[in-house]
Amino acid sequence: FSIGTDNVEQSKGGAKKKLAIFDIDMQKYYDYIISDTIYNDLPCYVFTVRVKENLEKKQIEKALIRKVLSYFDKQNFNVIYREYKFVYDNWFINLNMDVIVYLDYVGGVHVPTKILYDGFWKVLFFKKERADFNLKLFDYQIK
């Protein structure tokens, strides 16, 4: 599936709609911010999607994706850094996940260099799961 679209396999519990952060019906819950910065010596565009601050609790609950922060290389629009925050809590599922992905160029190839994950989820009738890991990717053999 792709974050920001409704191209997901299942739509149980309205999750399909909740992942479509650019859908016209979901836009009322989010701020969309474009800026730029220098990140690791690369000029980057910064695109942030985050839940609006002035929402009521019931409105915030409509937004499974609480934040997506992306740094795009200005030269080719490759993602150099991406951060996700997911929060959802209802009678069927409770989840809270943070994912951060670092990407860079190795031998001219765009590759992930580090992935951080810190998450919790509990689905009705299943054991709750908690994971926290830091995956460092290195020694790429680019041919």
Language-model regions: role of each:
Residues 67, 98-107:
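Extended lipid/amphipathic-ligand handling interfaces
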Residues 89-94, 106-109, 114:
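Membrane-proximal, glycine/serine-rich, low-complexity loop/turn segments characteristic
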Residues 1-64, 88-90, 120-143:
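Structured extracytoplasmic
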Residues 49, 81, 96-98, 112-118, ...:
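Extended beta-sheet lipid-handling architectures
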Residues 37, 72-73, 104:
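Hydrophobic alpha-helical segments, especially N-terminal targeting/anchoring helices
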Residues 65-68, 72-86:
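Long, charged/polar, surface-exposed segments that mediate recognition or autoinhibition
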Residues 40-48, 78-83, 109-114:
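Short, hydrophobic/aromatic-rich segments at coil-to-beta transitions
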Residues 57-59, 94, 99:
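Flexible domain-boundary/linker segments
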